[in-house]
Amino acid sequence: MIILPAIDIKQGKCVRLYQGRFEKSSVVAESPALTAKSFENDGAKYIHVVDLDGALEGEIINLDAVKSIVQVTSVPIELGGGIRNIKVVEKLINIGVKRIILGTAALKDKEFTREAIKEYGKSIAVGIDAKDGYVAVNGWLNVSKINYIEFAKIMEDMGTEDIILTDISKDGTLKGPNFDMLKKLQENVNCNITASGGIKDLDDLIKLKEMNIYGAIVGKAIYSEKINLKEAIAVIEKR
């Protein structure tokens, strides 16, 4: 299992949200690039980056911050937030982003999603952000009427191999991930599943590893020092 430390960027700085609410954001670090470098030094094999302003605006806003992360680290990064057309995907791949996460666009623009998966294959992941079991879009502000499993199956049929599942109610709470949701998703699709939201300690990571989850995104637990990234990576790699 891969542990992906998270960098959420708002107005050029690293922030953490609480249950996906933008008004409840707090700055945890001034420099996304320096934060990424520290994650690399701790042994991170992949870094999860979200352009929060982009998620709201529907276009990449913090491109300079993303570029700076790519320039200072050799660790591959995945990026989500506001990626809505193939030209942006191409641009991001060209500047060195390893994996692109489609969220709102995957739900609202099937033609673009199909084109992106066909063109870039393994470089495209689908982010499913769920609230009470239903897919949320537009920076989590709107909840659709599509069940997360139903949506995951559609995305798998379209050819995606990677799904990132976030339970919005758990995000930033340090109350543990939604293991039941993850298990149900595992039972219904054959994609690589990355867990996001609520991971609070090493025990959560061990349980996810035992479930054969592909990846675990950890944000607040690292910033609040509930999880030591270096130690966690070492423990998970040995299991």
UniProtKB/Swiss-Prot annotation:
It is found in: Cytoplasm. It comes from the Bacteria. InterPro entries: Aldolase_TIM, His_biosynth, HisA_bact_arch, Isoase_HisA-like, Isoase_HisA-like_bact, RibuloseP-bd_barrel. Its main location: cytoplasm. Keywords: Amino-acid biosynthesis, Cytoplasm, Histidine biosynthesis, Isomerase. GO terms for cellular component: cytoplasm. Pfam families: His_biosynth. The keyword Isomerase applies. Its EC number is 5.3.1.16. It catalyses: 1-(5-phospho-beta-D-ribosyl)-5-[(5-phospho-beta-D-ribosylamino)methylideneamino]imidazole-4-carboxamide = 5-[(5-phospho-1-deoxy-D-ribulos-1-ylimino)methylamino]-1-(5-phospho-beta-D-ribosyl)imidazole-4-carboxamide. GO terms for molecular function: 1-(5-phosphoribosyl)-5-[(5-phosphoribosylamino)methylideneamino]imidazole-4-carboxamide isomerase activity. The active site is at D8 (proton acceptor), D129 (proton donor). The keyword Isomerase applies. Signal peptide: none annotated. Pathway: Amino-acid biosynthesis; L-histidine biosynthesis; L-histidine from 5-phospho-alpha-D-ribose 1-diphosphate: step 4/9. GO terms for biological process: L-histidine biosynthetic process; L-tryptophan biosynthetic process. Transmembrane segments: none annotated. HAMAP family: HisA (MF_01014). Belongs to the HisA/HisF family. This is 1-(5-phosphoribosyl)-5-[(5-phosphoribosylamino)methylideneamino] imidazole-4-carboxamide isomerase.
